[in-house]
Amino acid sequence: MNFELTEEQKMMVDAVKRFVDKDSPITRFRQMRTTETGWEPKVWKTMADNGWLAVSFPEDHGGYGGNFVDTSLILEQLGRGLVPEPYIASVVLAGGLLSRLGTPAQLEKFLAPMLEGRTSLAFAYAERQGRYETSDCETAATKSGAGYTLRGEKVWVLNGHAADAFVVVARTSGASRDASGLSLFLVDADAPGLKRIRVPGMDGHSTGLLKLDGVEVAGDRLLGEEGSALASIEWALDRGAAAACAEAQGELQTLLTLTVEYLKQRKQFGKAIGSFQALQHRASDMFAEVELCKGMMILAAIQADSANDLERKSAISAAKVQLQQGGWYVQENSVQLFGGIAITDEQDVGLYFKRIRVLQGLFGDADWHLGRYSSLPGFEGAAA
């Protein structure tokens, strides 16, 4: 398998890297995390003008016909500067579902403005009792004339505090954990009966708590077929997990770079602590884990576009496990090698540490993905 980037991909990576270095270094993230939205519409528009929002969408949907590897390359660079714009929420999750299931009218109204950087989107799927089980949904959508009435609550909605519209998971039939009966609806942020509350996160990003109290949606706001959304939800969350691995890769690499630089500068007993062999071994092990995460991230990005559900699920679950296990080794050792200053807000190490920790838990933690991986067909035979 050829992992070499095309010339177009190399140019794109260089452009995103220059953008992060010049226009969105970590100092900008420090400023943005104290604002109401946590990101800037003008920067979102710049990203759209550069083609980074539309790169992986089909040309007939307003995109450039790229693939998920292109998306991952962008996210890896954005992770270096902790760029706060809602790329995963808008582009990967909600945008991906619209591209997969949307009618021409829905694409024109919701996807096109987002790809142009004029709006942002969010995917509201998680509920308090759900953990990581995608079929666990108590939000109900009942028939109301030619449309539907939505009632329920959604938690941890990425970009939910700032989005212009939502893709909402609601149950149109069945019990709360049935695999069938789940549907997707397009809901405007200003819809009567919809209340959203901003919830600050430990990583400096905010999410939204959505309360739907009799939200009326027209029949043309149903995204895809009624009662058959589970496969698309799983597909979207898998791509979200692959995207989390890609963003975290940029952050892990930066964490390693910061740590190695500190080992060269910090002196003890009259010499740089990086000259001590024991710490060199520790840094070497950190490098190995970062590279393992990168290899698994690349495979997950490739398989995110696979039509084979087994290949997609196995590659992405494996990458997510490596991110949590190998990534944690990098995180804890960066803190230990820096010492107490690493956990202060003034030190960038702590900001990367917290963001990676959030990404490790998004879309399934290591325990959940290990469980899914071991349950996939062929696992027992492969182990034997």
Regions found by a protein language model. Name each.
Residues 87, 129-132, 156-159, 175-176, ...:
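Short Gly/Pro-enriched turn/cap motifs at secondary-structure boundaries
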Residues 1-85, 101-106, 113, 117-118, ...:
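Alpha-helical interface subdomain recognition
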